[in-house]
Design a protein with these regions (language model features):
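Extracellular adhesion/carbohydrate-binding repeat motifs centered on closely spaced tryptophans
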Residues: 2-462
Length: 462
C-alpha cells in the first residue's frame, strides 16, 4: 500500500495559500491577511473552528484564531497535513495518540483517511482491494486481531492461507528468530480461510479434528494450531484412533517406518522401537486384533501382498496360527522372519519355529489359500499345516494321519507309494499309488492302529 510518513503534529498560523490556488473575495470568502489567508463571513468576521473549501475544491480547517491549521488532528477523526489540506484517500504514519487523554506517544502507527477525510477505525476496512484492521482509535493493527480469529501481517494486510505464527496467547515477540520447521512449542502453523478467518474445528468433545485443505488432510486443535507427528483423534477406541502427520502437517498415507506414539493411552505396550505402519487414504492406520484372536478374515491385501496387522498397528511377522474365518478350524501362516518382511510367505523353505528349531515347510503358492500351510502330499512329501512330517529317527517308516488318510512316510518325510516295506519293528506295510496304507502284515488294513497324529508347528509368541 502507498503510505506517507509524517513526523510531528503542529498548528500553522501563517500558511500561505497561493493566488493560483485560492481566490480572494470581496465579501464572504477567502481573503489574504498579510502573509496568511483567512476566511470571512458576510459581516467581515473571521470564521473559526470550521472547515472551508478553497478554489481548488480541497478542504482546510480554520483554527480558533481563524488561521489555517496544519499537521494536526481535527475533531479526533480528521487530519490536516503540512499543506493545510485535509488528508483524504491516503495512509499516514503518525505518532500514536490517546484521544481520551489528549496525548500522543513517540511510537508511530499507520492511519487511513477515507474519501470524506474521516479516519477509518474500529474494525475491518477494505482498502485497495485488501483488508486491514483498525482499533477504536484508528491505529492500523498487526498480528492477532478480533479475538485472535484473524491475523494481519506486518504491512497490516489480512492473512489468507497458511502462516507460521507465534501462538496468540504468547507474550514474547520473537517471530524474526523462528522459522517454519523449527522446534518451537510457542509457534504453530495456522490456516486462514478465504474470508481471512482462522480455521478452528468444532471438536464435539475430541481434542483434535482432521480437515481437508486442497485435497490433503491436516489436523488442528481447539485453537486452530496445526498438528504434526502422532495425534490421537479420539474417534474410537484403540490404536485406530491415531493418525500420523508429517512435518508439513499433511496426513501420512501408505507405509511409514517410525517410532510409536509416546503416549500409550490404550495400554497397548507400544514400546519405543521403530515399527512399520500402513495408513489409508484418509490417514487411518491398519489395525487388527491381538494375534491370539486373529483369523484369516483379518488378512489384508496391499499392492498384491498379504499382511496381518496386530492391535498396535504393526504388520505381524513370524510363524502364526490363524482361525479360518469363524469355522473353529485353524491354519498356519508364515509372515517372514523379521520386520523387513512382515508379509505372507508362499512356497517351500526352512522356517525357525517358536521353540527355536528349524523345520521344513510348504505354504500354498496360489489360489484362495495362497500362503496357508499345506496339509497333504506335495511333490511326494507329506505336510501338515505346512510342516514336513517325518518318521521318527530309528523307525525307518511311520504311519501318519493327515486329512483322515493314513500315509506311510520315511524319516525324510517322503511318502512311500505303491510299495511293500517293513519298519524297524518288522511290521510290514503295503501302500497305494497315493502312499496310503492298504495292508498291514499282509492283512487288508488302513493302518489306523499304527497311525499317529501329525506334528503341529510350534508357533511364535509375542
Amino acid at each position: 500500500m502507498k503510505k506517507q510518513k509524517l513526523a510531528v503534529c503542529v498548528l500553522s498560523a501563517a500558511l500561505m495559500i497561493g493566488a493560483a490556488t485560492l481566490t480572494s473575495y470581496a465579501a464572504e470568502g477567502w481573503q489574504q491577511s498579510g502573509n496568511s489567508w483567512i476566511y470571512v463571513d458576510n459581516n467581515g468576521n473571521k470564521v473559526t473552528n470550521t472547515w472551508k473549501k478553497g478554489a481548488d475544491n480541497l478542504w482546510r480547517y480554520l483554527d480558533s484564531q481563524g488561521n489555517i491549521a496544519s499537521n494536526c488532528w481535527v475533531d479526533d477523526e480528521y487530519f490536516v497535513e503540512s499543506t493545510g489540506i485535509m488528508a483524504t484517500d491516503k495512509w499516514l504514519k503518525l505518532p500514536k495518540r490517546n484521544p481520551a487523554w489528549n496525548e500522543t506517544s513517540a511510537t508511530t502507527v499507520w492511519y487511513y483517511f477515507s474519501t470524506s477525510g474521516k479516519m477509518v477505525s474500529d474494525g475491518w476496512s477494505k482498502i485497495g482491494g485488501k483488508y486491514y484492521y483498525f482499533d477504536g482509535d484508528g491505529a492500523m493493527q498487526t498480528g492477532w486481531v478480533d479475538d485472535d480469529t484473524y491475523y494481519t501481517n506486518a504491512d497490516g494486510v489480512m492473512q489468507i492461507g497458511w502462516a507460521y505464527l507465534e501462538d496468540p496467547d504468547d507474550t514474547k515477540k520473537d517471530d524474526d528468530e523462528v522459522k517454519p520447521g523449527d522446534d518451537d512449542e510457542d509457534h504453530h502453523w495456522y490456516y486462514f480461510q478465504s474470508s481471512g478467518k482462522k480455521y478452528v474445528p468444532s471438536l464435539g468433545g475430541a481434542k483434535y479434528k482432521q480437515y481437508k485443505i486442497d485435497g490433503t488432510y491436516y489436523s488442528f486443535d481447539e485453537n486452530g494450531a496445526m498438528q504434526t507427528g502422532w495425534v490421537d483423534m479420539g474417534n474410537s477406541s484403540g490404536f485406530a484412533n491415531y493418525r500420523y502427520y508429517q512435518s508439513n502437517g499433511q496426513v501420512q498415507t501408505g507405509w511409514l517406518s517410525t517410532t510409536p506414539p509416546e503416549d500409550d493411552d490404550y495400554n497397548l505396550d507400544l514400546g519405543s522401537d521403530v515399527q512399520w505402519y500402513y495408513f489409508s487414504s484418509n490417514g487411518e492406520p491398519k489395525v487388527g486384533p491381538k494375534i491370539s484372536d486373529a483369523s484369516t478374515s483379518n488378512l489384508v491385501r496391499i499392492n498384491n501382498i498379504t499382511y496381518l496387522f496386530n492391535e498396535k498397528g504393526n504388520p505381524v511377522y513370524g510363524l502364526r496360527r490363524l482361525e479360518v474365518g469363524t469355522s473353529g478350524q485353524y491354519a498356519c501362516y508364515f509372515f517372514g522372519a523379521d520386520k523387513a518382511t512382515s508379509s505372507v510367505v508362499k512356497g517351500k523353505g526352512n522356517v525357525v519355529e517358536g521353540d527355536g528349531t528349524t523345520g521344513q515347510f510348504y505354504f500354498a503358492d496360489s489360489g484362495n489359500k495362497a500362503g496357508r500351510g499345506y496339509s497333504g502330499v506335495e511333490d511326494g512329501f507329506l505336510y501338515y499345516m505346512g510342516k514336513l512330517q517325518k518318521a521318527d529317527s530309528g523307525t525307518k517308516y511311520e504311519v501318519i494321519e493327515v486329512n483322515d488318510k493314513n500315509y506311510l512316510v520315511t524319516t525324510s518325510g517322503k511318502v512311500v507309494k505303491s510299495s511293500t516295506v517293513k519298519d524297524a519293528n518288522g511290521t510290514k506295510f503295503k501302500t497305494s499309488s497315493a502312499g496310503v496304507v492298504t495292508e498291514v502284515d499282509g492283512t487288508s488294513d488302513d493302518g489306523s492302529d499304527e497311525a499317529r497324529t501329525p506334528v503341529e508347528p510350534t508357533y511364535w509368541e509375542d
